[in-house]
């Protein structure tokens, strides 16, 4: 007999950034996967290829009972039936209060972030730090009366807050310190770490005693992914067979790649646990024991199955029809390509462009970077539902199907 799915009752949930990559998947799960039942919002996949046939997600993730609202800067795209959508600016108190008065959320899930690849420091700080603080204080009742009380606030941080972008990380847990200031070479990660500190410090400190937590996903990929999956397949499409045989480093470096649906699931579990904690506090009971505590805590979120970096890259290429056999691989030294990347960055920088090979790409292709998610498994009840290979099948299938649809529209 099929296993009975648990039910998560979450009340009124406001997903901030709900039209983005992760946010869309959170909304889809909250609404019990209209993407699998409504043809108008179905995720495309290649037809007639069993490699892209996967079990239904709705049969495996919990059923949710929630009133779902979405706040994003622009909500014209990536909509799902069953949710209410609001255009808003998290850096504007006035904009947020107007939306909160309509939604009256019990839970805020904050996924909105400035794009890490833009490199605009002013924008990164304005959105990731100042915007998070404004949203947090509006939700907690410190910035005006919106006629309700938000009970729980879940913040999407990043596993990169524990990483200096250079060192190898092996099974790192939440005891590892945040990498801040001069030690942090990536400004995006510094802003995410600062925002995380603000969110966790705000736990039970607001007029409404709202409880908070932060989740740190590592290497998110999946349908609608515009970073890892898209760029790996873009490279496969443009590169010659000779270039595809080139491997940066020795491929002994394990790396975390986490399916976006599992990350979305962790957010719903966190919201559910926070609501349970808030109920305890409101009823006068003592809070959870330290080793069970969710509020005021940060959690690493992974697929609990690190993979060799080039194995998953070549697996993605193979799904797209670009197969590179192990005996065809040419191993190139990181010590050689790092300086080459630096030279290319300098040359391309003179004409205002970014080369395809940079020092960052070389380092990330060669480093070991994986985390422990034991804390999330124990305290949130988290366990990845979709495996890394299935997630890759879903992610690659989506990109290939979208490309086919776009070609058909153009009449090519």
Swiss-Prot record:
Pathway: Steroid metabolism; ergosterol biosynthesis. Its EC number is 1.1.1.-. It is an enzyme of class 1 (oxidoreductase). Pfam families: 3Beta_HSD (PF01073). The keyword Ion transport does not apply. SUPFAM superfamilies: NAD(P)-binding Rossmann-fold domains. InterPro entries: 3Beta_OHSteriod_DH/Estase, Lipid_A_modif_metabolic_enz, NAD(P)-bd_dom_sf. One of its GO terms (biological process) is ergosterol biosynthetic process. GO terms for molecular function: 3-beta-hydroxysteroid dehydrogenase [NAD(P)+]/C4-decarboxylase activity. Its main location: endoplasmic reticulum. The keyword Nucleotide-binding does not apply. GO terms for cellular component: endoplasmic reticulum; endoplasmic reticulum membrane. Keywords: Endoplasmic reticulum, Lipid biosynthesis, Lipid metabolism, Membrane, NAD, NADP, Oxidoreductase, Steroid biosynthesis. It is found in: Endoplasmic reticulum membrane. It is a peripheral membrane protein. The active site is at residue 192. NADP(+) binds at residues 17-23, 89-90, 111-113, 188, 192, 217-220. Substrate binds at residues 158, 188. Signal peptide: none annotated. In Aspergillus, the biosynthesis pathway of the sterol precursors leading to the prevalent sterol ergosterol differs from yeast. The ring system of lanosterol in S.cerevisiae is firstly demethylised in three enzymatic steps leading to the intermediate zymosterol and secondly a methyl group is added to zymosterol by the sterol 24-C-methyltransferase to form fecosterol. In Aspergillus, lanosterol is firstly transmethylated by the sterol 24-C-methyltransferase leading to the intermediate eburicol and secondly demethylated in three steps to form fecosterol. Belongs to the 3-beta-HSD family. Sterol-C4-methyl oxidase; part of the third module of ergosterol biosynthesis pathway that includes the late steps of the pathway. The third module or late pathway involves the ergosterol synthesis itself through consecutive reactions that mainly occur in the endoplasmic reticulum (ER) membrane. Heterotetramer of erg25, erg26, erg27 and erg28. Erg28 acts as a scaffold to tether erg27 and other 4,4-demethylation-related enzymes, forming a demethylation enzyme complex, in the endoplasmic reticulum. This is Sterol-4-alpha-carboxylate 3-dehydrogenase erg26, decarboxylating. It comes from Aspergillus fumigatus (strain ATCC MYA-4609 / CBS 101355 / FGSC A1100 / Af293) (Neosartorya fumigata).
């Amino acid at each position: 007999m099929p296993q009975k799915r648990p039910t998560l009752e979450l009340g009124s949930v406001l997903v901030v950034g709900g039209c983005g990559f992760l946010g869309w998947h959170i909304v889809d799960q909250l609404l019990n996967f209209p993407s699998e039942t409504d043809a108008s919002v179905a995720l495309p996949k290649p037809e007639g290829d069993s490699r892209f046939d996967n079990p239904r997600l709705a049969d495996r993730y919990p059923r949710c009972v929630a009133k779902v609202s979405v706040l994003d800067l622009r909500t014209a795209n990536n909509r799902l039936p069953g949710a209410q959508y609001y255009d808003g600016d998290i850096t504007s108190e006035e904009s947020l209060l107007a939306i909160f008065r309509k939604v009256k959320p019990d839970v805020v899930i904050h996924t909105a972030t400035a794009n890490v690849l833009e490199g605009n420091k002013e924008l990164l700080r304005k959105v990731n730090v100042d915007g998070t603080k404004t949203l947090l204080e509006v939700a907690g009742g410190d910035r005006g009366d919106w006629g309700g009380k938000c009970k729980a606030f879940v913040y999407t941080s990043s596993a990169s807050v524990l990483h200096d972008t250079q060192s190898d990380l092996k099974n790192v847990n939440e005891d590892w310190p945040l990498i801040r200031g001069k030690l942090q070479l990536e400004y995006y990660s510094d802003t995410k770490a600062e925002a995380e500190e603000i969110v966790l410090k705000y736990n039970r400190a607001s007029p409404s005693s709202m409880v908070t937590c932060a989740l740190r996903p590592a290497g998110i990929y999946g349908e609608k992914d515009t970073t890892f999956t898209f760029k790996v397949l873009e490279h496969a499409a443009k590169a010659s067979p000779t270039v595809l045989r080139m491997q940066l480093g020795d491929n002994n470096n394990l790396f975390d790649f986490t399916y976006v649906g599992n990350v979305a699931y962790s957010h719903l579990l966190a919201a559910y646990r926070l609501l349970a904690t808030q109920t305890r506090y409101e009823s006068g009971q003592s809070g959870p024991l330290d080793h069970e505590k969710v509020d005021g805590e940060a959690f690493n979120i992974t697929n609990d199955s690190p993979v060799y970096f080039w194995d998953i890259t070549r697996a993605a290429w193979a799904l797209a029809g670009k197969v590179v056999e192990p005996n065809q691989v040419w191993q190139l030294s990181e010590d050689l390509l790092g300086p080459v990347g630096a030279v290319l960055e300098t040359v391309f920088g003179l004409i205002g462009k970014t080369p395809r090979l940079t020092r960052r790409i070389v380092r990330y292709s060669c480093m070991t970077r994986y985390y422990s998610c034991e804390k999330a498994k124990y305290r949130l009840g988290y366990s990845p539902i979709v495996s890394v290979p299935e997630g890759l099948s879903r992610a690659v299938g989506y990109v290939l199907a979208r490309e086919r649809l776009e070609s058909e529209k153009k009449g090519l």
